[in-house]
Amino acid sequence: MSAMRIHLPRGGCWPHRLSLAWNIAVLAITAFVSAVWANIWVDSLRDYRPPLAQWDATASDAPAGPALIEGLVLVLLEGVPADYLDRTPALAGISAAHVRMTGPLSSYTPASGWITLVSGASPRLAGAPLQGAADSVLWYARAETLFDVTADAGRQTALYGPVWWRGMVAAAKRSESVLFGSAGEPAALAALAEARRQLESQPPALTLVHVRWPDGFPTASLDDALRGLVRAVEPSRQTLLLAAAPARGTARLMAFGCGIRPGAYTGMRPADIAPTAAALLGVPAPARSEGTIFRSLLAWDAEAEARSLAALAEVRWKLAEAYLAGMGASLDVGPLLGEREAVRQAVGAGRWPAAREGAEKLLAVLDGLMREAYHRRVWGDRLWRLWLPIMYLAGAILMQGRAWRRKELPLAPALITVAAAGLPAVWLTLSRGTRILESFAGWQWVLAGLGAWGTLAGLWGMWVLRRESWDIWERWRRAAGLVQLLAAIWGLPLAFLMWWQGLVVWWDLPAPAGAAAQAVLLTQLAGLCAGGLAGILAAPFLKS
């Protein structure tokens, strides 16, 4: 049998050889990117682990500030209207401390967002999977939570909400919990009723109530149940934190009771909830807390403020040590030992202003080191992948010119396909999704329209292949060129997005933007899989 050789349909001049070589290279790169993306997708669906996944440190041995309250009730309302806290009669007049914050639904699934509220850690640091069913997200999370630090302090906890909180309950040592397997109005009202009975009989130190209200459903029954829960809270000894998260948009936090300074505040982040709650309870912040204490909200003296900030700095020190080691950055907390010791000495000597200022500076420097380690890891991983988008760009440009000269695909539909596939991915990458939270519904229609035009362009090209009087080999060859062209065009923004975001760090996108990016990437994945079909269609080029 003779050796395999490449059959050139139009002679053997070097432009055709070069064009065919580029096609083969693009096919190979497409297969490589498809495999990489498929691995990422499978890992994220199952159990994606960041560099800190094996870090099992806790904050139980860290110091804590003095307790400001005897009990904390944290209520999470999911799916209620954006103005629910302002217009609900059950909440009217009980407090003026309304805190605006970015939505707690800070990842692709609501469960990942609630992890941030109870642990202070982003899903990236919490060890939560990128995607997956809600009942698996909290189960896989490895971050220490308010339940753990409160139980380690010898105090009781209670949880009432959906059954997928079972992983959080299992982590707590002592918990009076009732979990509901179904969502909707009955389960939400039952959770509020169970929490109210517990607060009226033997109130725990920490009570979490999670209500998943149907989007757009009337809230009259919810108002009545919430009114009963509010009446069960004793404001002279307890504090109520109520986070209302609509289906889309900005969440609101209402706080009232002991330890709270009434007023209107802005700038609180979801990651600040856990450290602030820990300061109220007088327990250490969870070990992976990335947020800070929202001090404007708390009614405390100079000693309590200094001790709480110093305790948070100790927890953040351990996190920074593990984070810098996990990210492989050439950064170290060793040079900050002097600042750490100065804060400890100031607390021991009762110099509260000096302790507060030193803890603030230490926290800022530690956070800066972790950000620098993150950026170094991202850019370090981007460098070796820089050739990938360059190869895609060169191959796509060459194939576009070749297809235009051979009239295999009109230029206008091809450009529409580029707009449908590339611009959303690149735009989401550069903006990180922060500017589409309020216009997500309209943006979906734009994506649908552009995607429809791109699909019509591909169908038109296939119709041309069927209409022309070519033999079967010519049709296969031109179909291979068409599929390769579409795969390369759709694969270019995906390659750029993977290069920009990095494979070993978490994708920092809010929920709506993440859903849009996920939809775009899934369509791009379909285009990349079409590259494999192109390889099959190109088989007639190889003859023995």
Which residue ranges define each predicted feature?
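A post-motif C-terminal structural segment
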Residues: 249-252, 256-294, 298-302, 308-311, ...
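Metal-dependent active-site segment of extracytoplasmic phospho-/sulfohydrolases and closely related
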Residues: 73-76, 87-91, 218-255, 277-281
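Active-site-proximal alpha/beta segments of enzymes that process anionic O-linked groups
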Residues: 26, 30-36, 43-57, 64-204, ...
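Alpha-helical transmembrane segments of integral membrane proteins
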Residues: 375-544
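Anion-binding catalytic surfaces of enzymes that hydrolyze or transfer phosphate/sulfate esters
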Residues: 19-23, 32-36, 167-168, 174-230, ...
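N-terminal Sec-pathway targeting helices
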Residues: 7-29
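Histidine-centered active-site microenvironments of extracellular/periplasmic hydrolases
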Residues: 236, 241-263, 307-308, 433-441
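Phosphate/adenylate-binding glycine loop and adjacent helical scaffold
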Residues: 296-387, 456, 490-496
